[in-house]
């Protein structure tokens, strides 16, 4: 048994082939996959090393990959985890080391995937003939998952379910909202997962002041009569689950919150029924019309792709659309989070429900097992 989760050689070869095909279409002779501070998934997708402080992976067809990492003390662990790469310290300056490598390999053109800073991009542009942004191409490579990726996402979903279960055990009158985060993370850290997100909103049902979970927990005590909404994702080696739920605290749901959640449940059912291979993104938006028919709207995104990033299609409703509906169709193997955050138009009250699922020939299927519904705690 490996010390760290790993994909099979066949899966990594599939990715490598897709990357080299992308490079050929873009007309580049080298690829830089770059990541920093945990951002930049291409590094891990190709090499299996999750970018820590900084990582630069140089890919040249016919040559061994070179992975430059920062800081120096990260080098031993990167050598244990990275697959099929010559792992080196990035030196005092990673871009300088990268430019030296490019010079040795014969610099012509460079494709880039990842969040390079402006100054880094400028220096690389001065060192090579052509720099081509391949971020959009990387996103396309991540849209359709392999069977092994679905298995990894299923494990992430299992750990996310466990996190929400632990959070509900902690959500009692008198508990600090910040303790919910501790309970959430405690459910999956020992299994090798880390926090992707845990967002909470706690407000009084009788006088609601929050319609969507927040990114930072307040120093507030939970009280009987509160409503708790959450959005939780456990990250298991580059793949995250996502579960959204609403709970009431030591009190039954008020008629108002029952109506909100009823609309959210109806929207969830209509949206998931509309998702199938070949369905256009506009069909999914149309299915959400039950929300407006009930007199409500949304704040959070309605649907988004997931598994390797926050992926297309990112959709809203007709009453809350922050961007044009993309001209794209659903494909078998995609993963989509369906998450109707049904709220009042004054943005004072709202509920969350939904979860991540994957698409096969028959349609959308949940990867989570946590029960649905508006549930009373205590």
Indicate residue ranges for each PLM-predicted region.
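Active-site neighborhoods and metal-handling regions in enzymes and metal-associated proteins
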Residues: 1-378
């Amino acid at each position: 048994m490996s010390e760290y989760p790993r994909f099979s050689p066949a899966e990594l070869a599939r990715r490598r082939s897709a990357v080299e095909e992308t490079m050929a279409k873009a007309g580049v002779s080298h690829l830089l996959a770059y990541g920093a501070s945990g951002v930049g998934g291409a590094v891990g997708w190709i090499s299996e090393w999750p970018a820590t402080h900084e990582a630069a992976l140089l890919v040249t067809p016919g040559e061994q990959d070179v992975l430059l990492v920062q800081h120096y003390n990260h080098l031993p662990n990167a050598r244990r985890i990275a697959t099929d790469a010559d792992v080196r310290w990035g030196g005092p300056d990673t871009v300088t080391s990268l430019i030296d490598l490019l010079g040795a390999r014969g610099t012509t053109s460079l494709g880039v995937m990842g969040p390079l800073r402006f100054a880094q991009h400028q220096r690389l542009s001065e060192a090579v003939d052509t720099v081509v942004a391949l971020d959009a191409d990387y996103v396309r490579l991540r849209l359709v998952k392999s069977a092994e990726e679905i298995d990894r996402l299923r494990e992430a979903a299992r750990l996310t379910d466990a996190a929400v279960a632990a959070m509900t055990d902690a959500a009692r009158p008198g508990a600090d909202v910040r303790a919910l985060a501790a309970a959430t993370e405690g459910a999956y850290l020992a299994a090798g997962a880390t926090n992707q997100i845990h967002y909470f909103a706690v407000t009084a049902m009788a006088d609601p002041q929050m319609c969507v979970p927040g990114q930072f927990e307040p120093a507030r005590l939970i009280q009987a009569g509160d409503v708790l909404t959450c959005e939780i994702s456990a990250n298991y080696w580059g793949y995250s689950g996502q579960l959204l739920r609403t709970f009431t605290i030591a009190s039954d749901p008020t008629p108002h919150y029952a109506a909100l959640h009823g609309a959210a449940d109806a929207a969830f059912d209509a949206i998931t029924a509309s998702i199938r291979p070949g369905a256009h993104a506009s069909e999914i938006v149309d299915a959400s019309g039950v929300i407006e028919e009930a007199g409500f709207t949304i704040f959070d995104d309605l649907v988004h792709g997931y598994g390797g990033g926050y992926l297309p299609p990112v959709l809203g409703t007709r009453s809350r659309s922050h961007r044009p509906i993309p001209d794209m169709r659903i494909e078998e193997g995609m993963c989509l989070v369906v998450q109707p955050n049904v709220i009042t138009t004054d943005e004072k009250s709202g509920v969350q429900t939904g979860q991540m699922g994957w698409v096969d020939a028959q349609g959308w299927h949940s990867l989570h097992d946590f029960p649905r519904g508006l549930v009373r705690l205590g």
